Amino acid sequence: MKFLKYSATLFMAGILTIGLSTQALAQSDNYSKAVAAFNKALEQAKANEFESAINMYNQAVSLAEESDNEKAGDLVDRAQSQLPSIYFQLAVTKYKAFQQSQNIAGLEEAMTAFQEAADISEEYGNGQVAQKASNIVTQLLYTRSIIEFKSQQYDAAIASLDEAIERNPNYAKAYYQKGLVIKNQNDEDLDIALEMFDKAIEVGKQVNDNQIVRQATEAGRDNLIYRGVQNMEDKNFARAEEQLNRALEYDAESANAHYRLAELHNKQTNWDQAISHAQKALDLETGGKTELAKIYFELGTALKAQGRKAEACSAFKNAAFGSFQSPAEHEIEFELECESST
């Protein structure tokens, strides 16, 4: 019986030894497979096979984590450190594909890929790639809004811009674009659009985005001048004056705004103000004879009304060009009977 017990003990010890040896071999085999997977991933990444490389790096991590090899932890770290840049490069290829297709579906794929790159980079402690990828997602939201705007999907465009602004409140360009979308969506929402232009100017100055500051300033000015002229033609003079003066708040050196104010004041027989704005417009105008002619005509009109014949004649002579030539000559010859310069 003692022999049988001893034999049984030896048998069980043998099974345990064999089991431990098999486990050790399996762990050693896992590490070897992890190394092979890592090397394969490197080759695939060099060949721009980024999706395959990602899968292989993840496989290397899984295998290494199942191994007790003293080098397994280092292999896990090395594989995970490669993933942020590989995810980012994959996202870049998605973006290049979008550049070829220029459709929303391709753009969405690129955005998703860059967001994945940002998330993976954050998870594995690569803050630089995480920030870069996240910033690109914000820029692509702006790009999406442009596509939506051009296809008159105004609500979708505003939603994209709101998301971009939420991600980056200092994104001056997004405020400017939102103003354009709102203005085009409903022409009656000019005041709301102007709020966006004002915000774009404010943020643009803070981040030194001079191009957006200029564009938003011009948009505010030009839209107010356009609306002011419409109200002037509708004889809504008080509203027109308010809008034209507000245009000057955007651009105090706008020759066009001063010209339109001269025209407006002439219609209301405010001769002194008409002359003042016409003279400012002449000082600021950088265009040629065509642009100057219309200003001189308004100046001549106000001077004539004040009985300042010689000055009015001089103004109308300068106005006698292009589409203003005939009405200016009529004033010179028949209304004022100006002396001939010959």
Q: Which residues does each predicted region cover?
A:
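Start-of-helix register in tetratricopeptide repeats
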Residues: V35, R78, S85, K132, ...
